[in-house]
Amino acid sequence: FAVVYLAYSMVWELGIYASGFAMDGVVELLLAQFGAVLALFATYFSLKKVRTLPSSGLGFTIRGRGKDVIGGILVATLLYSFGFGISCFAGWIQVESFQWPWKSILTTWLLFFLVAVYEETLLRGIVLGKLLDSGMSKLVALVLSSLLFSVLHLLNPHFSCLPFANLFLAGVMLGASYVYTRNLWFPISLHWFWNWLQGPVLGYGVSGIKIDEPALTIRFSGPEMLSGSSFGFEGTLLCTILMIIVTGVIIGRCRQIYR
């Protein structure tokens, strides 16, 4: 299973790289991602019958999890409010114009929801879930699944050491709650709005991928590790700091609730 989906994910990354997020390619990407989600679920339920996947299930129980969805959205919003605000104040980015291309905004909103469902189901629901079910410690399982999450982005444009480290930290941040709750709604909503706010709304690249019609057009100043001009906000030291803080808060909160 892991080999098949590692190969599939690499093909998916190449497809994004080839077509970009231009509007004439977004619909195709949306359909392709929808197909990927369907294939993932079909494979999971087929292989679950032979006990090769997490016995605990994927983590899509929705009852009582509305606060997790809201929480993930709020965390992403607050993180980018601080990150974008600090970057503007420091002069690393400047807003040049604003528009609201509703078709692009809506389509990418749906696209990044499917991306979040796919990646969180695969990396957290299946990979991390299987590692935890095997008796592996929470820390080791979280580290291994986060490394895989970062490796799956190796083919993205402008990938380098800092984006690798930050995507690893993003994997830890997204998986931190799952090791306690075994539920995906918080990481899905956080991942969803993380990507959507970063690219289509604020005008950064998303993991190195340029967004064609963002709401904000921004100009970058200073070195890449401060401005995120090539890879996006995920390629900045400020992102590193904020993710470490957010991850610490998530783990601390989960330890309080799920003792």
Label each residue range with its predicted role.
Residues 1-54, 199-259:
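N-terminal, membrane-interfacial amphipathic/helix-forming hydrophobic leader that caps
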Residues 30, 69-74, 105-106, 139-144, ...:
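Hydrophobic alpha-helical transmembrane segments
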Residues 30-42, 102-110, 118, 122, ...:
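Membrane-embedded alpha-helical segments of multi-pass membrane proteins
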Residues 80-83, 112, 116, 138-154, ...:
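Small-polar-interrupted transmembrane alpha-helices in polytopic inner-membrane proteins
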Residues 118-144, 176-183:
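Membrane-interface helix/loop boundary segments of multi-pass membrane proteins
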Residues 163-224:
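Functionally important transmembrane alpha-helices
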